[in-house]
Amino acid sequence: MASYGEEREIQKNYWKEHSVGLSVEAMMLDSKASDLDKEERPEILAFLPPIEGTTVLEFGAGIGRFTTELAQKAGQVIAVDFIESVIKKNENINGHYKNVKFLCADVTSPNMNFPNESMDLIFSNWLLMYLSDQEVEDLAKKMLQWTKVGGYIFFRESCFHQSGDNKRKYNPTHYREPKFYTKLFKECHMNDEDGNSYELSLVSCKCIGAYVRNKKNQNQICWLWQKVSSDNDRGFQRFLDNVQYKSSGILRYERVFGEGFVSTGGLETTKEFVDMLDLKPGQKVLDVGCGIGGGDFYMAENFDVDVVGIDLSVNMISFALEHAIGLKCSVEFEVADCTKKEYPDNTFDVIYSRDTILHIQDKPALFRRFYKWLKPGGKVLITDYCRSPKTPSPDFAIYIKKRGYDLHDVQAYGQMLRDAGFEEVIAEDRTDQFMKVLKRELDAVEKEKEEFISDFSKEDYEDIIGGWKSKLLRSSSGEQKWGLFIAKRN
């Protein structure tokens, strides 16, 4: 591993070599940079919080392809880059903006300092991948200090492997897994002089759609974090990632449901239900609660559709991005809350959701959002846990409360879709199919008991067996139901 001095010298020489041309192609290390820039720049800017009148610190500012946009809205921009010729070119382009200060400096330098809580937004595009692991950690701590409470940190990195097609004699870039950045920034915390504790809350994380559309590449990933008080309640996402969908739990579920899947029946039920959608090439599909991406890859690969998969669980999206490596399919992933996420009206041909909406308390509001997001003639297909119209037994009520579920009977669920404006609503009780699938999955796990315990643990095995048997018991007693819902926007 390179020492601090060696690492900085290697990175500086690399960028001196690749910034001779001072063009967008040189900065993006890609022959199609101009076309990509036209698509990705507005996408990245749309991902940011409102910046009107704010103070923005831009690291790795380069020749200023984002500096220009930031300067037009922000109150003040401090643009920093460690290659002198590059920051001078930025100043030549953007120097007429009187609210921009240009600094030639290395972000890892001990002399790089700003007052605590002085920045509304710290922005960087392709910076951390040119720092060592320790340098990323040190800079993250400083950025947390420099950001105002309620302020934001945005960064975008190349993960897994190279994206640009420019030839390079050597490449010192650190192509990390996205979960490296997520974990490091999530664990970052500080105390101020008064003893108040602060940390970073993940607002969203997504792959850049321009690269998915143009290169079938999901490894261009951006994050948006907000500085919050450590006692802020971010309960539901934390519950999903620390309790129900811990990384170990996701791998267990995937073992049961099949590679890429964490919902009932895996690929088999996916094929059956997707066939009902009559997908056509070029259509746009939104998968709400996409999990680890198996259904999205299936739709994109077999029907040539463009899929956007969203999930509130950071762990789920991390696995989905790993599964996407090398598949070359048109699937975008984003950590997002479907009750807060905004899409333009008439965006999607299909909205698809498998065993997810049970987590949502205000289903009528969500279904109204779905209706707006769909194009006229668009379809929604949902499978979800449901319940009997009768009052739940004490045991079932405890299960529902513990999981934070909001369950309805099948017909009431269908009526909520009608009330949201949907037509041609089909609401089917598929509990018999659910039980057959559960039995098959249970048998498969029991048959490979020793292998399962070896790969996970005895406790994991008993959790899965116990959980599946409980679901079977609740379903056979008529308490737990499984519903299939299809509806159309006219």
Swiss-Prot record:
Enzyme Commission designation:
2.1.1.103
The UniProt keywords, alphabetically, are: Cytoplasm, Lipid biosynthesis, Lipid metabolism, Methyltransferase, Phospholipid biosynthesis, Phospholipid metabolism, Repeat, S-adenosyl-L-methionine, Transferase
Chain ranges passing through the membrane: none
Question: What's the catalysed reaction?
Answer: phosphoethanolamine + S-adenosyl-L-methionine = N-methylethanolamine phosphate + S-adenosyl-L-homocysteine + H(+); N-methylethanolamine phosphate + S-adenosyl-L-methionine = N,N-dimethylethanolamine phosphate + S-adenosyl-L-homocysteine + H(+); N,N-dimethylethanolamine phosphate + S-adenosyl-L-methionine = phosphocholine + S-adenosyl-L-homocysteine + H(+)
Record carries keyword Methyltransferase: yes
- Specify the domain of life of the species encoding this protein: Eukaryota
The knockout outcome noted for this protein's gene is: No visible phenotype under normal growth conditions. The double mutant nmt1 and nmt3 exhibit severe compromised aerial growth and reproduction, extensive sterility, drastically reduced phosphocholine concentrations, and altered lipid profiles. The triple mutant nmt1, nmt2 and nmt3 is seedling lethal.
- Residues bound to phosphocholine are S158, S163, G164, R168, Y175, Y253, Y385, Y399, R403, Y405, K471
Q: List the disulfide bonds.
A: none
The residues that hold S-adenosyl-L-homocysteine are G60, R65, D81, D106, V107, N125, V262, S263, G289, D311, D337, C338, R354
Where does this protein act, in terms of pathway?
Phospholipid metabolism; phosphatidylcholine biosynthesis; phosphocholine from phosphoethanolamine: step 1/1
**Main location, first listed in the record:** cytoplasm
Q: Tell me the compartments it is located in.
A: Cytoplasm
GO:BP terms for this protein?
diacylglycerol biosynthetic process; methylation; phosphatidylcholine biosynthetic process; phosphatidylethanolamine metabolic process; pollen development; triglyceride biosynthetic process
Tissue specificity comment: Expressed in root vasculature, shoots, rosettes leaves, cauline leaves, sepals, petals, anther filaments and ovules. Highly expressed in leaf vasculature.
* Positions with a binding annotation for N-methylethanolamine phosphate: Q244, Y245, Y253, Y385, Y399, R403, G404, Y405, K471
Q: What class of enzyme is it?
A: transferase
Gene Ontology MF terms in the entry: phosphoethanolamine N-methyltransferase activity
Q: Name one GO cellular component term.
A: cytoplasm
**What is the documented function of this protein?**
Involved in phosphocholine biosynthesis. Catalyzes the N-methylation of phosphoethanolamine, phosphomonomethylethanolamine and phosphodimethylethanolamine, the three methylation steps required to convert phosphoethanolamine to phosphocholine (PC). In association with NMT1, regulates PC homeostasis, phase transition at the shoot apex, coordinated organ development, and fertility. In associtation with NMT1, involved in phosphatidylcholine biosynthesis and vascular development.
The UniProt similarity line reads: Belongs to the class I-like SAM-binding methyltransferase superfamily. PEAMT family.
Which PANTHER family does the record cross-reference, listed alphabetically? PHOSPHOETHANOLAMINE METHYLTRANSFERASE (PTHR44307), PHOSPHOETHANOLAMINE N-METHYLTRANSFERASE 3 (PTHR44307:SF17)
Q: What is this protein called?
A: Phosphoethanolamine N-methyltransferase 3
Gene source species: Arabidopsis thaliana
